[in-house]
């Protein structure tokens, strides 16, 4: 087995003594640092490479901290108008994953870079930590590489804000295939619109 295979097996057994100790020490360190911080190299090189990372110019990795828990409805003093059914405030669940939120925060802060992918690295009772792989679309090494220069096209600006990354496609329900998923495409909203639009076709 190569080195990456050993690293992969280590990460598969997160409850082992080695990983528990490592993760506790790292988590303590992450808590002391800012919410978005650049890292020199990926914490999980095997995972990062599977998701498209290359150790060359133009690729950047940032660690993002996201607070865990549900989403509270942002209303002043808990005043929600309407029926009692819709007056919930605290026990609501955000429709997007925390990973997609981490990608969004990194993408907003680093507007000149393109978000390629992301992966989980750590968590404690309060936070989850993700590493985000970003690509500098203006770098000549990226623009010349046929495997990655697709991301230089203008259509890929802020793909993380439009649900086009892997995490984004997951929360949009686009991972599955077959007849069971026909209501998820092209999007939930488009399907709703198609089903709720009265179409009176001319008889020919």
UniProtKB/Swiss-Prot annotation:
GO cellular component: cytosolic large ribosomal subunit
Gene Ontology biological process terms from the UniProt entry: cytoplasmic translation
Residues forming coiled coils: none
Domain of life assignment: Eukaryota
Keyword set includes tRNA-binding: no
InterPro entries linked: Rbsml_eL15_core_dom_sf, Ribosomal_eL15, Ribosomal_eL15_CS, Ribosomal_uL23/eL15/eS24_sf
Sequence intervals crossing the membrane: none
Keywords in alphabetical order: Ribonucleoprotein, Ribosomal protein
Gene3D superfamilies: Ribosomal protein l15e
GO molecular-function terms, A-Z: RNA binding; structural constituent of ribosome
One Pfam family recorded for the sequence: Ribosomal_L15e
SS bond partners: none
Keyword Ribonucleoprotein assigned: yes
Family membership: Belongs to the eukaryotic ribosomal protein eL15 family.
Name of this chain's protein: Large ribosomal subunit protein eL15z
Species of the source: Picea mariana (Black spruce)
Organism lineage: Eukaryota, Viridiplantae, Streptophyta, Embryophyta, Tracheophyta
Gene name as annotated: SB61
């Amino acid at each position: 087995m190569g080195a990456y295979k050993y690293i992969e097996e280590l990460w598969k057994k997160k409850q082992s003594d080695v990983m528990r100790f490592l993760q506790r020490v790292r988590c303590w360190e992450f808590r002391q640092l800012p919410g978005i911080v650049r890292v020199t190299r990926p914490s999980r090189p095997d995972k990062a490479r599977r998701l498209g990372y290359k150790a060359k110019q133009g690729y950047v990795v940032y660690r993002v901290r996201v607070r865990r828990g549900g989403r509270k409805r942002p209303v002043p003093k808990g005043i929600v108008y309407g029926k009692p059914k819709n007056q919930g405030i605290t026990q609501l669940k955000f429709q997007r994953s925390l990973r997609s939120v981490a990608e969004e925060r990194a993408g907003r802060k680093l507007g000149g870079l393109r978000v390629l992918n992301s992966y989980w690295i750590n968590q404690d009772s309060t936070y989850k930590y993700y590493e985000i792989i970003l690509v500098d679309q203006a770098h000549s090494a990226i623009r010349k590489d046929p495997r990655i220069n697709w991301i230089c096209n203008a259509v890929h600006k802020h793909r993380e804000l439009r649900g086009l990354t892997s995490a984004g496609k997951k929360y949009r329900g686009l991972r599955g295939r077959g007849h069971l998923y026909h209501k998820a495409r092209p999007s939930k909203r488009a399907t709703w619109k198609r089903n709720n639009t009265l179409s009176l076709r001319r008889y020919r």
